[in-house]
Amino acid sequence: MKKEELKDFCKSIGIDCVGIAGVGPYYDLEKIIKQRLFNGYTTGMEEPIIEKRVNPKETMENVKSIIVCAFPYYIGNFNESNLSKYCYGEDYHIVVKDMLQQICNHLSDNIDNFDYKIFADNGPLVDRYLAYLSGI
């Protein structure tokens, strides 16, 4: 399947921001991660094994490319609250995974032996870096 066909399908299901990232390994990212660790700029939620963050083949040995999607996140204004906005409405992990599953189902229907893994802000790779690489 061509990249434009994939993007057209994604638009048909409401995903306007789609790109394709290469599979690395991402040695420039490794340097950034090590510097952030040295400076203490971590949240504790990151994958602790750096190689898993910079080498997609550690997560999926036969990976050929990475489809990256960005989703709008506006849920309205809540001025009188101490809760983060992501706490309102349906869990975005569920919504995003459902939409990504639609893409994977479409690809599985059109590509023999299509294999995939879905991550929605919960995988070992660095989402923002993949978005950068994919051009979105």
Which residues are covered by each model-predicted region?
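Auxiliary alpha/beta "docking" domains used to position bulky ligands
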Residues: 1-136
